[in-house]
């Protein structure tokens, strides 16, 4: 198998908003920066799938309120489980993050020359601003209006961009992270990266579940990578399920913002049911909405397709055209859209401080892969704000911590790299270890079969509603999968690639399930029926 070694000042794992923001900050400080992505930098992952909404208090938007109000709403939404220092940083630096994005070429919707702001459930003031994606043909990948300008800026700045690489482990010597290693997704090739700093910005966990709003390459790798390197994780039991996902094939996420402007959730009987579940009615937070939708469907009041409806008839046509034009286009003259729930966002993750430091020397993290900002539930708009704010903070602090310029010392000999990779089943001198004659590997569970069963277990037992017996059963099965995969006999490179990916997925799924098992009370997005 071919081996490629890369030396760089900073290695950023993940090519979405958080990773690109960190990379641009590092380049501004003269650092040699490499972004490695499982998909295409700036053109894959969850950033391109977003609705482009960001929560920020802006001087030019008086109705957005104050930073203190933003902090308070975020704490209330997160059931006060949030890290308050991180929340304060999020709210205080949100405007700077928006201005940085504008400086990097990202357009925002404006009115009378000012950035427009609107309300959303969970927010007491109108602090949701939106990236202008009207120039894009499709609303399904509207986040490209956010990521493509940053991608072009990164290219102009001289950031090295490497696509199609699955990172399978972090390099760690004497307690310090100094790089990473992984596999090429298109050909039999191993990669080893040696760097002064590693920044994890690898996104969420959506593909651990059978139904998700997330992109196809978002499978929770970073949580496992950080954990294996010694980073702590927190709040892993809190998975947000989006309550308004279109039931058509595209599974497009529909903004909940119109619910603050008169839109109403209805069941198949036409009942506006949210008042049965929350005094806030249709202004309730997403965790409450998702459970309400789940209960309506479970009680037989869901649509034939297993969903409910958003009724937009009470939102004025002028407001729909001005603020919710993508939804108006999808309505196409109708007043309702059929929606359901799907795994959407991970509130928990790697523990960081306000500068993105993980506590492991040499390792930073930012964006959805981290925990602490959102607590038990995330408010709309805070995800993208978190990504840019803490991407900038991680890049800024890492870039100020050590002097760039000198080449990264090559400390690993080839034989050491060979031994390190072999621990993960990656063999450089020959393709793969031979399967013993007569060993019928076909009779064993397949990797695809294990992945399907894992997703089914996560959806059934670690989803919107959970129970002790279901969580224990899932813990046991995931542990069995983990043991089995340690000696799985790969026969070809494609199997090695799939196995390496699945090991990371199983570990992250286990971290989620164990956290859900340990928290016996219901809180935020974690709901125990027992």
Segments from the language model and where they lie:
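N-terminal Rossmann-like FAD-binding beta1-loop-alpha1 element of flavoenzymes
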Residues: 10-35
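Glycine-rich FAD pyrophosphate-binding loop
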Residues: 28-48
């Amino acid at each position: 198998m071919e081996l490629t070694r890369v030396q760089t000042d900073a290695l950023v794992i993940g090519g979405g908003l958080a990773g690109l923001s960190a990379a641009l900050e590092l380049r501004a400080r003269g650092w040699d920066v490499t972004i490695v992505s499982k998909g295409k930098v700036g053109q894959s992952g969850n950033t391109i799938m977003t609705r482009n909404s960001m929560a920020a208090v802006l001087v030019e938007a008086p109705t957005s309120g104050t930073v203190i109000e933003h902090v308070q709403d975020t704490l209330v939404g997160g059931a006060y489980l949030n890290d308050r220092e991180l929340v304060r940083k999020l709210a205080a630096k949100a405007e700077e993050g928006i201005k940085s994005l504008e400086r990097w070429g990202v357009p925002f919707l404006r009115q009378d020359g000012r950035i427009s702001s609107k309300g959303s459930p969970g927010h007491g003031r109108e602090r949701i601003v939106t990236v202008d994606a009207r120039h894009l043909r499709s609303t399904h990948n509207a986040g490209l209006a956010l990521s493509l300008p940053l991608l072009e800026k990164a290219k102009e700045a001289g950031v090295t961009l490497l696509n199609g690489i699955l990172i399978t482990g972090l390099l760690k010597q004497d307690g310090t992270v100094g790089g990473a290693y992984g596999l090429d997704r298109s050909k039999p090739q191993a990669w080893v990266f040696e760097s002064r700093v590693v920044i994890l910005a690898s996104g969420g966990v959506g593909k651990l579940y059978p139904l998700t709003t997330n992109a196809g390459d978002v499978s929770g790798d970073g949580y496992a990578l950080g954990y294996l390197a010694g980073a702590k994780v927190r709040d892993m039991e809190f998975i947000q399920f989006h309550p308004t996902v279109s039931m058509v094939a595209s599974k497009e996420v529909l903004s909940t913002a119109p619910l603050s402007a008169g839109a109403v959730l209805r069941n198949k009987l036409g009942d506006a049911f949210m008042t049965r579940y929350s005094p806030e009615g249709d202004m309730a937070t997403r965790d409450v909405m998702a459970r309400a939708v789940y209960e309506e469907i479970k009680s037989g009041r869901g649509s034939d397709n297993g969903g409910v409806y958003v009724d937009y008839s009470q939102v004025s046509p002028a407001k729909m055209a001005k603020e919710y034009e993508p939804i108006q286009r999808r309505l196409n003259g109708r007043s309702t859209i059929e929606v359901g729930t799907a795994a959407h966002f991970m509130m928990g993750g790697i523990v960081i401080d306000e500068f993105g430091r993980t506590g492991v020397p040499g390792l930073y993290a930012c964006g959805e892969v981290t925990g602490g900002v959102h607590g038990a539930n995330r408010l709309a708009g805070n995800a993208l704000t978190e990504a840019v704010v803490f991407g900038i903070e991680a890049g800024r602090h890492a870039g100020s911590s050590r002097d760039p310029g000198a080449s990264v010392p090559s400390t690993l000999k080839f034989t050491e790299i060979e031994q390190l990779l072999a621990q993960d089943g990656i063999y450089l001198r020959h393709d793969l270890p031979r399967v013993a004659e007569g060993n019928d590997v076909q009779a064993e569970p397949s990797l695809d079969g294990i992945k399907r069963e894992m997703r089914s277990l996560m959806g059934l037992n670690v989803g919107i509603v959970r129970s002790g017996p279901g969580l224990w059963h899932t813990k046991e099965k995931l542990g069995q999968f983990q043991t089995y995969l340690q000696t799985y006999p790969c026969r070809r490179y494609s199997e090695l690639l799939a196995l390496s990916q699945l090991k990371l997925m199983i570990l992250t799924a286990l971290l989620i399930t164990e956290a859900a098992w340990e928290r016996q009370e219901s809180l935020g997005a974690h709901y125990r029926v027992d």
